[in-house]
């Protein structure tokens, strides 16, 4: 029995080697076609092979071939063909119900980074990639994928979209460094404190207390226009500092007095008090309002920020909640 099992294993290994060798030969032919400029023919052959492999349940071979093909087309400036094969990479992951792994997330982020930032395919790709990476949990996507997307968007100086993805990652330090660059290159000197205040409040609304603390500490230490603190010259920064301490303590009276004392600073952005209402519920036991007083844009923003995090009150999670609309 043992000998038979060993022989079967050896045969399987030989078949696997032959299959991989076959894939490599096919890849070589396809690469030669692309190098010659026969883009259309090569693209159609990639698609044909994809569906053939998928019908034979060779999901890994299909995915790896589409990934290498996408990179090849990107290197030759063939955006449409590359984007199409990138979608097929996702299709293989979805249909085979492949488990999330760091290497796969990095491959998806690599493809994303090579796509034309203005292409509609990129929007579709990132939406599907995040959905797959959530593993059917109903979350907003894997924090690691969000981090990788945020880093790419930061390099492209797409700060608003980068901030969105950082908020759903676990990378508070990266978020802070991006916000420092965002503030110094695009913001007004008078708004230095507002960049980090919004991020901290939104992290807290997503029950990510750890990243909220890291983003505040890193930002205030590294921003060239912020003097050493605490305490800080800017009242809003002092409020955020006290708020983070209060969240750790969990005392409602401290939170209430803090919000009352700093109302002049909090009135600088109408969303601050909306965020603080939610933070009061999450960390200080404040009961939800019976009837929502939020309407229009503010109501939509708050609803989209809270999302599924309302269903879970006990644990911190960087991926809780629904998408945050960023201005």
Curated annotation (Swiss-Prot):
<dbReference type="GO" id="GO:0036506">
    <property type="term" value="P:maintenance of unfolded protein"/>
</dbReference>
<keyword id="KW-0900">Congenital disorder of glycosylation</keyword>
<dbReference type="GO" id="GO:0071818">
    <property type="term" value="C:BAT3 complex"/>
</dbReference>
<feature type="modified residue" description="Phosphoserine">
    <location>
        <position position="12"/>
    </location>
</feature>
<dbReference type="GO" id="GO:0051087">
    <property type="term" value="F:protein-folding chaperone binding"/>
</dbReference>
<keyword id="KW-0597">Phosphoprotein</keyword>
<dbReference type="GO" id="GO:0006620">
    <property type="term" value="P:post-translational protein targeting to endoplasmic reticulum membrane"/>
</dbReference>
<feature type="region of interest" description="Disordered">
    <location>
        <begin position="307"/>
        <end position="327"/>
    </location>
</feature>
<dbReference type="GO" id="GO:0006511">
    <property type="term" value="P:ubiquitin-dependent protein catabolic process"/>
</dbReference>
<dbReference type="InterPro" id="IPR007317">
    <property type="entry name" value="GET4"/>
</dbReference>
<feature type="region of interest" description="Interacts with BAG6">
    <location>
        <begin position="195"/>
        <end position="271"/>
    </location>
</feature>
<dbReference type="InterPro" id="IPR011990">
    <property type="entry name" value="TPR-like_helical_dom_sf"/>
</dbReference>
<keyword id="KW-0007">Acetylation</keyword>
<comment type="similarity">
    <text>Belongs to the GET4 family.</text>
</comment>
<dbReference type="GO" id="GO:0031647">
    <property type="term" value="P:regulation of protein stability"/>
</dbReference>
<dbReference type="GO" id="GO:0005654">
    <property type="term" value="C:nucleoplasm"/>
</dbReference>
<dbReference type="GO" id="GO:0005829">
    <property type="term" value="C:cytosol"/>
</dbReference>
<dbReference type="Pfam" id="PF04190">
    <property type="entry name" value="GET4"/>
</dbReference>
<dbReference type="GO" id="GO:0045048">
    <property type="term" value="P:protein insertion into ER membrane"/>
</dbReference>
<comment type="subunit">
    <text>Component of the BAG6/BAT3 complex, at least composed of BAG6, UBL4A and GET4/TRC35. Interacts with BAG6; the interaction is direct and localizes BAG6 to the cytosol. Interacts with GET3.</text>
</comment>
<dbReference type="GO" id="GO:0071816">
    <property type="term" value="P:tail-anchored membrane protein insertion into ER membrane"/>
</dbReference>
<comment type="function">
    <text>As part of a cytosolic protein quality control complex, the BAG6/BAT3 complex, maintains misfolded and hydrophobic patches-containing proteins in a soluble state and participates in their proper delivery to the endoplasmic reticulum or alternatively can promote their sorting to the proteasome where they undergo degradation. The BAG6/BAT3 complex is involved in the post-translational delivery of tail-anchored/type II transmembrane proteins to the endoplasmic reticulum membrane.</text>
</comment>
<keyword id="KW-0813">Transport</keyword>
<keyword id="KW-0832">Ubl conjugation</keyword>
<keyword id="KW-0225">Disease variant</keyword>
<dbReference type="GO" id="GO:0005737">
    <property type="term" value="C:cytoplasm"/>
</dbReference>
<keyword id="KW-0963">Cytoplasm</keyword>
<feature type="modified residue" description="N-acetylalanine">
    <location>
        <position position="2"/>
    </location>
</feature>
<dbReference type="GO" id="GO:0005730">
    <property type="term" value="C:nucleolus"/>
</dbReference>
<dbReference type="GO" id="GO:0005694">
    <property type="term" value="C:chromosome"/>
</dbReference>
<dbReference type="GO" id="GO:0140597">
    <property type="term" value="F:protein carrier chaperone"/>
</dbReference>
<dbReference type="GO" id="GO:0036503">
    <property type="term" value="P:ERAD pathway"/>
</dbReference>
<protein>
    <recommendedName>
        <fullName>Golgi to ER traffic protein 4 homolog</fullName>
    </recommendedName>
</protein>
């Amino acid at each position: 029995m043992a000998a038979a099992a060993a022989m079967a294993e050896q045969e399987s290994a030989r078949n696997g080697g032959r299959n991989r060798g076959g894939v490599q030969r096919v890849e070589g032919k396809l690469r030669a076609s692309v190098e010659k400029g026969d883009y259309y023919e090569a693209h159609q052959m990639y698609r044909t092979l994809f569906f053939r492999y998928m019908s034979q349940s060779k999901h890994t071979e299909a995915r790896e071939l589409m990934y290498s093909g996408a990179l090849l087309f990107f290197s030759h400036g063939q955006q449409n063909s590359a984007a199409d094969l990138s979608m097929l990479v996702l299709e293989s992951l979805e249909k085979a119900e492949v488990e999330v792994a760091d290497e796969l997330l990095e491959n998806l982020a690599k493809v994303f980074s090579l796509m034309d930032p203005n292409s509609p395919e990129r929007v579709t790709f990132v939406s599907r990639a995040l959905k797959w990476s959530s593993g059917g949990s109903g979350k907003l996507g894997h924090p690691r994928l969000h981090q990788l997307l945020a880093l790419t968007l930061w390099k492209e100086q797409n700060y608003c979209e980068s901030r969105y993805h950082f908020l759903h990652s676990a990378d508070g330090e990266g978020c802070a460094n991006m916000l420092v660059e965002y503030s110094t290159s695009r913001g007004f000197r008078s708004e230095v404190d507002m960049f980090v205040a919004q991020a901290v409040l939104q992290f807290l609304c997503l029950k990510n207390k750890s990243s909220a603390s890291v983003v505040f500490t890193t930002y205030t230490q590294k921003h060239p226009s912020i003097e050493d603190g605490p305490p800080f010259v800017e009242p809003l920064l002092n409020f955020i500092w006290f708020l983070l301490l209060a969240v750790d303590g969990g005392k409602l009276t401290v939170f209430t007095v803090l919000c009352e004392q700093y109302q002049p600073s909090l009135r600088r952005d109408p969303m601050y008090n909306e965020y603080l209402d939610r933070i009061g519920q999450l960390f200080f036991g404040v009961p939800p309002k019976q009837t929502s007083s939020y309407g229009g844009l503010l109501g939509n923003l708050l609803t989209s920020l809270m999302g599924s995090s309302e269903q879970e009150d006990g644990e911190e999670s960087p991926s809780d909640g629904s998408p945050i609309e960023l201005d």
